[in-house]
Amino acid sequence: MAVADINKSEVIKQFARGANDTGSPEVQVALLTTRINELTPHFKANMKDHHSRRGLLRMVSRRRRLLDYLKSNDADRYRALIEKLGLRK
């Protein structure tokens, strides 16, 4: 299930660093977090859906790599993003 276009554009507006920013780490992490949060109820209801779970784990891994990149290059932006998204660290 993909993120709805309206929801996606709202997330991009909220986390963009500029007017046409769609590729910054903040936007990418926010979009991945939105997709992960939308898929979580599916896996609670369908525990044996291992094929889709693999895709979820890829998204989580990709988000982790983007967060590591952001943390190594700009720790202040990293902390602000983690706080804004409500992630654990």
UniProtKB/Swiss-Prot annotation:
Single GO MF annotation: rRNA binding
CDD domains assigned to the protein according to its UniProt record, in alphabetical order: Ribosomal_S15p_S13e
Entry annotated with the keyword Nucleotide-binding: no
Keyword rRNA-binding applies: yes
GO cellular component: cytosolic small ribosomal subunit
GO biological process: translation
Keywords, comma-separated and alphabetical: Ribonucleoprotein, Ribosomal protein, RNA-binding, rRNA-binding
InterPro entries: Ribosomal_uS15, Ribosomal_uS15_bac-type, uS15_NS1_RNA-bd_sf
Entries under Pfam families matching the protein: Ribosomal_S15
Similarity comment: family membership: Belongs to the universal ribosomal protein uS15 family.
Function summary: One of the primary rRNA binding proteins, it binds directly to 16S rRNA where it helps nucleate assembly of the platform of the 30S subunit by binding and bridging several RNA helices of the 16S rRNA. Forms an intersubunit bridge (bridge B4) with the 23S rRNA of the 50S subunit in the ribosome.
NCBIfam families recorded: S15_bact
Description of how the protein assembles with itself and partners: Part of the 30S ribosomal subunit. Forms a bridge to the 50S subunit in the 70S ribosome, contacting the 23S rRNA.
HAMAP family on file: Ribosomal_uS15_B
Name of the protein in question: Small ribosomal subunit protein uS15
Native species: Cupriavidus necator (strain ATCC 17699 / DSM 428 / KCTC 22496 / NCIMB 10442 / H16 / Stanier 337)
Gene name per UniProt: rpsO
